[in-house]
Structures are given as C-alpha cells and as structure tokens.
C-alpha cells in the first residue's frame, strides 16, 4: 500500500477476499485425511476422499464442499456444534444440501481427529434468564464419528501479505479490515469491501456493498 501511495494513486481499494482457511486447532488436524474446503473446492476431482466424508462447519462454503463430495460419490455428513437455526449458511443452501443427500450430525463439537474418524463431544442449547442463547458441552458425552476423510470449513481469513503488513490499517480480531459504512478504512485514501471486511458472504452481498464504496471512492478523488 505504501508503494502504491508513493506512485501517486489517490485512492486504493482492497477487495482481496478471504483465502486462508481457519483451523480447528485440535489434535490430529495435520493428518493426511484432513483437507480444507477452500482448497478442496478448487479441484475436487483430484482428491481421493474415500467412501465416508465429514464436513466440519455450517456456512455456505461448508454446504458447497458437502454437496460436491456427495456428487462425487461419497457418503457425506456435516458435523456442527449447534442447530439448523444457528447455521450461518443460507436456508436455500441447507435445503439444497439435504436434497442432494447430505446428512447432518448436529450438537457435536470436534475434540480430536483420528485417521479413521472425528472424536466429538455433544453440546446442548442453553437459554439464560435474559433470553440469551449459548451452547455448553455435556460432560461424559464423547464419541467417535467414523469416516475416511474430514473437510474443515469453518470460515476463512484474509491473506496477511497486504492486510496485516500495512501500517495504520486496522483489523479486527479475525484479521478482517475495519471500515465504516462507506468502506473507509483507518488509512487515509484506502477503502475496502467484500469478504475481506465482512468475512465469507455471498457474491451478491459483496457486489452490493462494493457499489456503495465505489461512490465513496469517487467522492474522495473529486475532493482530494
């Protein structure tokens, strides 16, 4: 960004998306039967997943990975620690996954990955007196879900070469760029929009937000 500014650009727009998969941080995640959805979806035919596949996560990318694995012949399950209502995936994506034959294992949180499955602990929904919903693990409810391969799909984060290496460009705890409603970042003349700001969303949302930011960039260039 500093080099672009020194080259005379008035405004810079960051829309690099999120391409680094987030990890589960559980024992066994480096085993050879563990893959990341963002990588798998680039070339699914090149993966030999076996007969039974578990996708960990419940966003749109998780649904895409599960449906793709199912269409390629695997008996596919989505493992999620909450309920259908709590899934970040759109209702359309969830319903289409069901129609494709994807099965769902809910209220199960992964603890460890083995060569032949995922160790999990069951969870339950808890509603506090003020109506807030949370989930707690149930002691003694551990089990192992047998599978040949695991696909991790618990969201993505921005690549660090642009975002975290830029001085004065604020990011949140997830590594996403902080902006106002016009896409203005904490670095003068730098704007951002799309998944690099919001995290993984739909293309429609990214395009709609970027149109708003384009107007802000135009206004900035006219006044500077």
In which residue ranges do the predicted regions lie?
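FAD-site-proximal beta/loop scaffold in flavoenzymes
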Residues: 30-50, 129-200
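A conserved FAD-binding loop/helix module that cradles the flavin
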Residues: 193-223
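General small-molecule cofactor/ligand-binding pocket signal
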Residues: 35, 103-105, 119, 191
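Feature captures the FAD/FMN-dependent oxidoreductase FAD-binding
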Residues: 1-27, 111-119, 126, 149-151, ...
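Rossmann-like NAD(P)H-binding beta-loop-alpha module
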Residues: 48-74
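Rossmann-like dinucleotide-binding cores of NAD(P)H-dependent redox enzymes
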Residues: 66-112
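Cofactor-binding loop segments of dinucleotide-utilizing enzymes, especially the Rossmann-like FAD-
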Residues: 58, 81-83, 195
């Amino acid at each position: 960004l500093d080099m672009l500014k020194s080259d005379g650009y008035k405004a810079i727009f960051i829309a690099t998306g999120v391409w680094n998969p987030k990890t589960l941080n559980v024992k066994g995640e480096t085993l050879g039967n563990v893959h990341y959805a963002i990588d798998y979806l680039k070339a699914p035919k090149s993966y030999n997943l076996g007969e039974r596949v578990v996708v960990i996560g419940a966003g749109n990318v998780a649904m895409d990975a599960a449906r793709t694995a199912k269409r390629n012949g695997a008996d596919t399950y989505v493992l999620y620690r909450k309920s259908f209502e709590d899934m970040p995936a759109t209702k359309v994506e969830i319903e289409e996954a069901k129609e494709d034959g994807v099965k769902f294992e809910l209220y199960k949180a992964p603890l460890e990955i083995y060569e032949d499955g995922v160790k999990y602990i069951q969870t339950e929904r808890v509603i506090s007196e003020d109506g807030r919903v949370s989930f707690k693990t149930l002691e003694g409810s551990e089990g192992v879900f047998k599978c040949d391969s695991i696909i991790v799909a618990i969201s993505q984060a921005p690549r660090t070469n642009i975002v975290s290496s830029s001085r004065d460009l604020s990011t949140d705890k997830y590594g996403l760029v902080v902006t106002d409603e016009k896409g203005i970042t904490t670095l003068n003349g730098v704007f951002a929009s799309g998944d690099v700001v919001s995290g993984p969303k739909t293309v429609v949302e990214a395009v709609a937000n970027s149109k708003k930011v384009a107007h802000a960039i135009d206004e900035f260039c006219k006044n500077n």
